[in-house]
Amino acid sequence: MRFPILVLGALLTAPVTAQDIGAPDPLFRDNAVLDVTITGPLTTLVRERPKDDYVDGVLAYTDADGNGVELDLEIRARGHFRHANCDIPPVLLNLKRKQTPGTLFENQNKLKLVVQCDRSNRLEQAVLKEYLAYRILNAVTDKSFRVRLLSVTYINTEKQNDSEPRYAFLIEHKNRLAERFGLEDLEIEKTSVKSLDGAQLNLTSIFNFLVGNTDFSPVAGRPDDECCHNYVLFGKNETPQWAVPYDFDQSGFVDAPYAEANPR
């Protein structure tokens, strides 16, 4: 496995800077690659791609003291485009709250795991570049989703396999981001530009421009979806709404082989 550009190494070791208000959870305070093992019926997960039904699994890692930690979890497929078009779908990890206190995964429940679309080197690079896109945004605004890069060994309980570690990354849950800033996740149909915090909107719009991303809307969702397309809205009372972007796999910066620019 190799990194796409040298700057990623610096970002991996740089500490996350944050004030007491807005400090990320333990999982996202460290940028070192976390080695984990995920065990479960992976054949079912990949072939059937259940979005409504979970399969049981186990996540294991070694903590800072050298102790092995195992956490029971449920796993299901998720996503839209990548769910339909990738050999391996992105997944949602559902941890058991009673097992996480005192572990690196304290305060975590449901976590999005971004995996390689297929096993090619090019798609491995795409995962790393998308992770890097999140980290770049973290560097310019605390109001962004934190991420943690993993080296994952997958153990399939339905088939004997020799699995080499593969890169993936976890994304902070929107409820945890909201709690960091005393805001609420707004589940609304649509919004307007004038309702959004102007500085945050300008910053994230410039960011999307710089990474060559056209797959987003901060004011509306897809047909039949709540607001917004690849943005999450946060707010409280009469304060301006904060629009926070995610999903950068369609950007020119990531350069995934399946990416297509929005013709509009």
How would you name each of these model-derived features?
Residues R2-V7:
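Sec-dependent signal peptide recognition
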Residues G9-L11:
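N-terminal regions of proteins, emphasizing targeting and processing segments when present
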Residues T13-P15:
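N-terminal signal peptide c-region/cleavage motif recognized by signal peptidases
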Residues A18-R264:
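Phosphate/dinucleotide-binding and metal-coordinating scaffold of catalytic cores
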